[in-house]
Amino acid sequence: MAAMKTTPGLVNFFIFNSTYGPREGEEHEKIILYIPTEEDIDRKIKTIGLCEALVKFTETFAPDKPCESLHTQKSRQIFYQPEPDFWMIMTISIPFSEKIAKDGKNTIEYHYDDVLDNVLDAVLKQSYKMFKLFNGPFNYLSETYGREALKKRSEYFFLSYLQTLNFSSFDLLDIFAGIQFLPLDKNTFLKIQSFVNLIEHTFSQIKYTAFLYSDKLVWSGLEQEDMRILYKYLVTSLFPATIDSELADRSSQGYVVIQPKSHHGRFVTGPPDLKDIPTPRKPPRIFVNTDTEQEELLLICYKALDATICLLVSAPFPTLDFFKKLDMFIGPQLTTLANVICEQSSKKSLSSDQQYRYIYFNHMNLAQKSTIHSKKASVAGVSPEIMRLLGDISADFNSFQEDGETYVKTMSDCWVVGRKSDQREFFVILNQKSANLIEINEEVKKLSSCHFNNIFFMD
C-alpha cells in the first residue's frame, strides 16, 4: 500500500514591531497580527520573542541581511523585513509520508526538498505588496490612523488573503512574478498610445492608465513595480472573478438579452450599470508610488470584448455623470481597438509555440513568457519535481550572480536546460530520452532562434 503524502500548509503567520513594546510587561504591544488569532497570548509572545532573538543574533554576522529562514524537522520559517522595525514571519509545515516498516512500526519521512526557500520568500513578499497596494505601507497606516487601525486592517486583509494561498502549487513563476506583454505592430500600438493620451487629456482626474488585452499588458503609465503588483491582482483575482460573475448571471437567467448598443463596453469596477442611481458602487482604492509619496487613487476598470483599460483616478470620488461620460467616450473606441487587436492576435496564433515547454523571464522589464501552466498549452503538464528543479537552478543563478548555463538529465530521462544571460533567464524542458547533450543543445538553439530571435542569449 502506497504511503499517503501530506501537502505543505500554513502553521502560523505574524507581523510585529519591536519598538512598540520595548519594556518588560509590554511585549504584547509588539504584536500587529498573529494568525491563528485564537492562539494563547503567552504562546504568541514566546514565539515572537524567539524570532526577535534569532534576528538580533544573525545581525551580528550580517547587519544588512539578517535571518532569512529557519529550518526545522517539521517546519520552514521565512523572515521578511518590509519596512524598518517591521517584521513579517511565515511558518510552513514540511510535507511527510507515513510508512509501515517490516516490523510493523510506523515511520515518518519528511520531504524537505518539496519546500523551497526562494519560493516561500516570494510568496511572503507578494503578500506584503498586495497589502500595501490596497492599504499603504505599515508605517504610513500607523502614523496616519494609529496602531489600532493598522492592526485591524492587517487582520481584515490577511485573514482573507492567506486562505486563497495553495502552498503546494507555488513555483518558479511565483518567484519571477513577471508580466506577460502582448506584442503588436507599430501602427496598432500607436493607436493605443494615442487613445490613452486622449483619455488622460480629456479627463484630468485620471492620473495613470494601463491597457490590457486577454490578460496581457499592452501599455502602462505606472512605475514598473506598481504595475507588477497591479497586474498580479488583475489577472489572478479581479478578471477571473468577473468571468465567474458573468457565467453565474447567464446560468441563472438561462438566456442572454442583447441590448441594442453602439459598443460592447462596460465597467468592471464602478457602477454595474449606468441607470440613474444616486451613488455608484465605489471602485477599489489603491496606493502607488509608496516609496516616494503616498498616492491614493481609485481603480476604475472598463472592458470591451477582450480589451480592458485600467484608469487610476484621483479625488474627489467620481459622480455618476463622470462614469456616463467615460462610457460614451471610451466604449466605442475601445470596442474598435479590441477588434483590431483580435484580428492581429489570431494571425499570430497560427504559428503557436505551445508544443514547447519553457519559461522566459527578463529581470530588467519584468517580461515573462511561458507555456507552463498555460490554458492553451497542448503539451502535457510539468511535474512538481521538475518545477522544483527549475527553482533550484534559478536559485543557483541568483547566488552566483553571473551568466551561465545548466543542463540536467533527470531520473525519468527528461532534459532540463537553464540559461542566464544579461539579466534574462530561460528554461526549457525536453522529453527526448535518447538525445545526447549536443542534440539537446541544438534543439534549444532552434527554439531560441524561432521564438526569441530578437533576444541575445550567450552561446
UniProtKB/Swiss-Prot annotation:
GO terms for cellular component: intracellular membrane-bounded organelle; Mon1-Ccz1 complex. GO terms for biological process: vesicle-mediated transport. Pfam families: Intu_longin_1 (PF19031), Intu_longin_2 (PF19032), Intu_longin_3 (PF19033). Belongs to the CCZ1 family. This is Vacuolar fusion protein CCZ1 homolog.
